[in-house]
Design a protein with these regions (language model features):
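Short acidic-glycine-tyrosine-enriched beta hairpin
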Residues: 84-106
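Conserved short histidine dyad/triad with adjacent acidic residue
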Residues: 47-68
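A short, N-terminal "cap"/entry segment at the start of jelly-roll beta-barrel domains
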Residues: 1-53, 141-155
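Double-stranded beta-helix
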Residues: 110-155
Length: 155
């Protein structure tokens, strides 16, 4: 990654945080209970993997969690667009891709979508697994270490 890309990443993170905060102020985002009803998640643990199968209804705008580890994802049904620091990506099922450490996306769901992620973990509970794979914010040591490595590689 170049230093310019790192700056772009920081700007995207800042704008995404502002979007989330402004959305909370005007009650744009769903509360956790409603979100679980609208976006049910099927959780599976097997062979050192935590698999999350998420349903996302048409016309939903969502901001993903911040990822602390690399993982594959699969779009099994539907279509969506997401925005990250690299720009817009339009996806139609079937599709698979990779999520990198520090990724957070703004997503718009065009059609009812089934989104699956697979995470390597020795966790046996949802709470423990999520604490290992998702960061509360970009100040998480795993995320900042990734950014520091980018800086070191460009100096």
């Amino acid at each position: 990654q170049s230093l310019a890309k790192l700056e772009n990443k920081k700007e995207f993170r800042k704008k995404t945080k502002e979007l989330c905060e402004e959305g909370k102020e005007i009650n744009f985002w769903y509360d956790e209970e409603t979100l679980q009803e609208i976006n049910p998640v099927k959780h599976t643990f097997i062979g050192g993997c935590y698999i999350r199968e998420l349903f996302m209804p048409k016309d939903q705008l969502a901001v993903t969690k911040i990822h602390k580890q690399d993982n594959p994802f699969f779009i099994m049904k539907g279509s969506l667009s997401f925005l990250n620091e690299d720009g817009w990506l339009h996806i139609k099922a079937p599709y698979h891709g990779l999520t990198k450490v520090g990724t957070q996306r703004i997503m718009y769901i065009h059609e009812d979508t089934v989104f699956i992620t697979v995470h390597s973990t020795d966790s046996k509970t949802i709470k423990d697994a999520e604490s290992k794979i998702f960061a509360e914010d970009f100040n998480d040591p795993v995320i900042t270490e990734e950014d520091l490595n980018t800086l070191k590689n460009n100096i």
